[in-house]
Swiss-Prot record:
One term under GO cellular component: cytosolic large ribosomal subunit
A GO term for molecular function: structural constituent of ribosome
Function: Forms part of the ribosomal stalk which helps the ribosome interact with GTP-bound translation factors. Is thus essential for accurate translation.
Gene that this sequence comes from: rplL
Disulfide bonds: none
Keyword tags: Ribonucleoprotein, Ribosomal protein
GO biological process, one term: translation
Assembly mode: Homodimer. Part of the ribosomal stalk of the 50S ribosomal subunit. Forms a multimeric L10(L12)X complex, where L10 forms an elongated spine to which 2 to 4 L12 dimers bind in a sequential fashion. Binds GTP-bound translation factors.
InterPro entries reported in the protein's UniProt record: Ribosomal_bL12 (IPR000206), Ribosomal_bL12_C (IPR013823), Ribosomal_bL12_C/ClpS-like (IPR014719), Ribosomal_bL12_oligo (IPR008932), Ribosomal_bL12_oligo_N_sf (IPR036235)
Name this polypeptide is given: Large ribosomal subunit protein bL12
Family: Belongs to the bacterial ribosomal protein bL12 family.
Length: 125
């Protein structure tokens, strides 16, 4: 009995989803295989780590020190974060603290610049 590939495909085309599911299970049992999708391989060692560092897309703006002009720094923090006066003051008083987390590089750099111009010491992480 010769089996024609086209006849097999035509037979598959006429099957319902339930029948196809039963067929897959039967093939798995008969040949000892699994129809589960394979996981993608993990990134390599040091080369993968260096590439990940270069491709960083989210940054944290960290206020490391309030500086002498605390009022200006509080105003800058309020502008950047949209916090209320008390929350912004608490954040500035509690330095070093994250001002913003997970922001794009351009936004993070602008926030650091604004804080530095206000008299604070800030950094990008």
């Amino acid at each position: 009995m010769a089996f024609d590939k086209d006849a097999f495909l035509t037979a598959l085309d006429g099957m319902t989803v339930l029948e196809l599911n039963d067929l897959v299970k039967a093939i798995e049992e008969k040949f000892g295989v699994s129809a589960a999708a394979m996981a993608a391989p993990a990134a390599g060692g040091a080369a993968g780590g260096a590439a990940a560092a270069e491709e960083k897309t989210e940054f944290n703006v960290v206020l490391t020190e309030a500086g002498a002009n605390k009022v200006s720094v509080i105003k800058a923090v309020r502008e950047i974060t949209g916090l209320g006066l008390k929350e912004a003051k608490d954040l500035v008083d509690g330095a070093p603290k994250n001002v913003k987390e997970g922001v794009a590089k351009a936004d993070a750099e602008a926030a650091v610049k604004k804080l530095v111009e206000a008299g604070a010491k800030a950094e990008l992480k």
